[in-house]
Amino acid sequence: VSHILSSCTIVINGVDRAGQGQPGVSSQTEIPGKTISIATFKPQNNGTADVVINMSNFHNRYGGTDQSIILGSAEMLNQSFVFDLLFYNLTCTVLLLFSIFFIVLHLNYKKMPYILWFAFTTITISIRISVFYPHILAYIWPTIPWKLYFILRYSSMPLAALFFTIFIKKIFNMQYQYVYFGIVIMCILSTAFIVITPTLIISQYLYIQQAL
């Protein structure tokens, strides 16, 4: 079961096999999760299996899985997940190395300030990749607070747009200042809204952000 940024348990043939967080009947009893769920099981004697997925999303009203629930042999799924984990780990590492390179370059060439903004852009994109499937950050930092994980997941998009817009402005000297300031203000307000506002309210407006 893909990451749902909420909580769920997977019950197979009457036995709890895996889960994300802890489903509850209210926001007080729910503990939201921040990773994926992988459950191994064997079918019953008649070749069938009863699979029940319990979900609750009191912290994130739009929480839910938007990807397929994958069934297959344990070996095949494990190989697929390990490949994805290595691929996205490599992607994040390359982006971070790029950002470090550009930061060092900026320290040695003060006349090119736009390099620093490109470094910030690559760092933000790397963070964004790490908080989506296969959720590298959740494995590196298992105790990361769910609220912080939520903020990193959704603020990374306006922040990346903000840094990249400033980078473009610095390197090309944009003539249409009102367009530049409009994008910058919108990105700053969007980021501030995500950081300050309770997640229950934020989740109701995320589709607007995604549409923009």
Predicted regions and their residues:
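An acidic-aromatic loop/edge-strand motif
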Residues: 31-89, 93
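Short, solvent-exposed loop/turn and secondary-structure capping segments
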Residues: 13, 63-64, 135-136
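Intrinsically disordered, low-complexity acidic/polar segments
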Residues: 8, 19, 48, 60-62, ...
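Aromatic-lined ligand-binding clefts that engage carbohydrates, nucleic acids, or primary amines
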Residues: 1-13, 51-53
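Solvent-exposed beta-strand/loop surfaces of large extracellular or lumenal domains
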Residues: 15-36
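Residue-level recognition of short loop/turn positions
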Residues: 13-15, 155
